[in-house]
Amino acid sequence: MKTISSLAAIFVIALFASPAVASEQVPFNGSWVSHETYDVQFPVMFVHGTATGYATRIGRYTATYEEQVDLLTGSSVGAITLVAANGDVVFATQTGQGDPTPDPDIFSIVEVSTITGGTGRFVGATGTFTIARLVDLTTGDSSGSFSGTISHPAP
């Protein structure tokens, strides 16, 4: 009877310990190269973009993003979708801030992205990452990097 009670206790502990292990935060860092187009309807600028890069936990990826920028403050809100080479997806919402640089055509952009889920191995994913990039507003070309953390259920 004592053995059965011990086995039952181990099973219960393992059952409740598994979700904690699955949600462990791990580094999520990557490169960022993008191109975006703009639709200005003052005082809002709508941004439509595509990006490529390489990231930990995802490998090579492509991304699409949509943002609304308040031209009076430089702040933005939006959403981003990252697609891994195998088709697994990470979804995130983001808030950002754009600031001018000494070159009037170049802006420094910092965006904080909150992971809201995904598909494939990223179902239930959570975490945050910060994208820091420079964008040339005359061409729409942008480059930078991101860093943060991601958690997702174990495979």
Predicted regions and their residues:
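Bacterial N-terminal signal peptides that target proteins for export
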Residues: 1-8
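N-terminal signal peptide c-region/cleavage motif recognized by signal peptidases
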Residues: 17-19
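Beta-strand-enriched cores of mature, soluble protein domains
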Residues: 21-155
